[in-house]
Amino acid sequence: MVRRWIPSGRHLRNNDNTGDDDDSEFTNSMDSGMSIPSLRDSMTTRSSHNDPIKPALMNDSNKVKNLEKELTNAKIKIQVLYEYIRRIPNKDGNAPSLGNDTDFRNSIIEGLNLEINKLKQDLKAKEVEYQDTLQFVQENLENSESIVNTINHLLSFILTHFNEQDENAHLLDKEERETLEETLELSSDYVLEKMDTLSKFIIQFLQDFLHSKSRAESKQDKEEFLSLAQSSPAGSQLESRDSPSSKEENTDGGYQNDEIHDSNNHIDTENVMANSTSLPISAVESRFEKTLDTQLEIVIENLHKEYDQFINSIRLKFEKSQKLEKIIASKLNEQSHLLDSLELEENSSSVIEKQDHLISQLKEKIESQSVLINNLEKLKEDIIKMKQNEKVLTKELETQTKINKLKENNWDSYINDLEKQINDLQIDKSEEFHVIQNQLDKLDLENYQLKNQLNTLDNQKLILSQYESNFIKFNQNLLLHLDSIFNILQKILQESSIAQFDRKMKSIKSVPNALKNLNLIQPKLESLYTFIETALESIINSYISSLISMETPEQPHQQGNELTATPNKELTLRIEELQRRWISERERRKLDANASEARIKALEQENESLRSKLFNLSINNP
């Protein structure tokens, strides 16, 4: 739904549902010279006329479509005639007028094409104008619908709120309620009746309101006047005149009559004053009613004027459209006459050509009659042969047409087969696409897994590099520690053991990669460990024996020999036990070194394979 504002300040809406089924009725009424109804008649009797503006517009759109079809057919006919005229051969070389005829016909056809294009443009412009008119009509109808809705809302509000429950509100009698209900139940076509009823009720309500207000003000004025009269000296004289005895009334009768006459005059003046106060109220009331009536009349007159202007504009537009239709019909008639004349000229030209050809043949026959008499029989035979050939050619033509039809059928079947194959290929393509998509998803998953493995291997490589650096530091510290220990023990060791220790230390230091060649370094280190352990043990035992000999110098020599013998036995047993432990520990360390070396090689191979896979993936997916 499209909303827009028109210059008169009314808010209109344009619905897309244009009821275009009753166009012919409005156009018939316009053509027959019927008068357009006024605003009141159109709004109160719209249901009987069934909205005649919309069918006219629909009929015009149908006419436009039919005219466009006729124009296209005429253009096709003209093109066919032009091609036919262009392909007619110039059989008579002495007839140069055929080219001039074709040029003349071409010029006529071009002029007709220009007129057709101009008519098409005019039709499009009129179609746009009709659409704008239809939109304006719909907006006015929707505006009237909005007015009806507001009136219905006001009437329902009056019926619900002006009831007997509210004491201060205006009470509706039975007739007023019935008229309001009947007006509320009327359809949206009776806008003015609803407006009249609503305006009458509002006027009556305002009159009652002003009348009640004037009565209240008059009562208030009377009360104020009485209070003033009682407080004045005339009021006190009236009271004193009501209270005296009958004796005073009889004696002073004349005086009392004078006073009564004066008091009556005073009361008359007071009544005149009261009437003068009520006059402005009635004047205000009448003035308000007059202004309200004039405003309502002005509004109704404005609505009448707008409706009349709208109907006049529609009438002018439809008159223009009728004139345009007449012009188009005349142009089409002229075009059909031109086409008929072209056809007649074609037929006449073909007849003339045939006659010229026959005349030339007759002249030739007259000139060569003597020669043709001798060859007449041969010509007859040739004619018979030509007829036979013609029959044969017609049969061949029929067979060729049949063959062409069969070929067309075959081509149709072939096209259908190709379409089926295309559909099958489309299905296979979609299936293969799904398969490739699944494979791609799997490859993405594998790529993700390989990336994770590569990350884990990188982490392991970092850990191994840390282990390797730590091992190198540990090996260097261990060798320094062994050198320091050997320097300490060098004072009491033999030269052969010192040389052996130097060779082992040099061989250990000469190994390039200590972590990878751990199986070569491990036994040498273990031998150094055992060498140092035995040296320390012998030193400790000798030290202990020296301490014992120093503590007991008085013991006999025999006990000394026994003591020296027992430590030597213990030392030998200790050395044997240490040798066994050294051998078992060396074997265990060899096994551990071999296992760690195999594990390192497996990890390196896995790292290389993952690197190659990652390189291949980077090449395949740039």
Swiss-Prot record:
GO terms for molecular function: microtubule lateral binding; microtubule plus-end binding; protein-containing complex binding. It is found in: Cytoplasm, Cytoskeleton, Microtubule organizing center, Spindle pole body. GO terms for cellular component: mitotic spindle astral microtubule end; outer plaque of mitotic spindle pole body; outer plaque of spindle pole body; spindle microtubule; spindle pole body. Transmembrane segments: none annotated. Keywords: Cell cycle, Cell division, Cytoplasm, Cytoskeleton, Karyogamy, Phosphoprotein. One of its GO terms (biological process) is cell division. Residues 228-238 have a biased composition (Polar residues). The keyword Cytoplasm applies. Signal peptide: none annotated. Its main location: cytoplasm. Residues 239-250 have a biased composition (Basic and acidic residues). Residues 1-58, 221-263 are annotated as: Disordered. It holds the Pfam family Mto2_bdg. Phosphorylated by CDC5. Spindle pole body (SPB) component that acts as the gamma-tubulin complex-binding protein of the SPB outer plaque. Anchors cytoplasmic microtubules at the half bridge of the spindle pole body (SPB) and accordingly functions in nuclear position and spindle orientation, including anaphase spindle migration into the bud. Recruits KIN4 kinase to both SPBs when cytoplasmic microtubules are defective, to delay mitotic exit. Links cytoplasmic microtubules with spindle orientation checkpoint (SPOC) components and, therefore, could function as part of the sensors of spindle orientation defects. Present with 639 molecules/cell in log phase SD medium. Homooligomer. Interacts with CDC5, KAR1, KIN4, SPC97, SPC98, STU2 and TUB4. This is Gamma tubulin complex adapter SPC72. It comes from Saccharomyces cerevisiae (strain ATCC 204508 / S288c) (Baker's yeast).
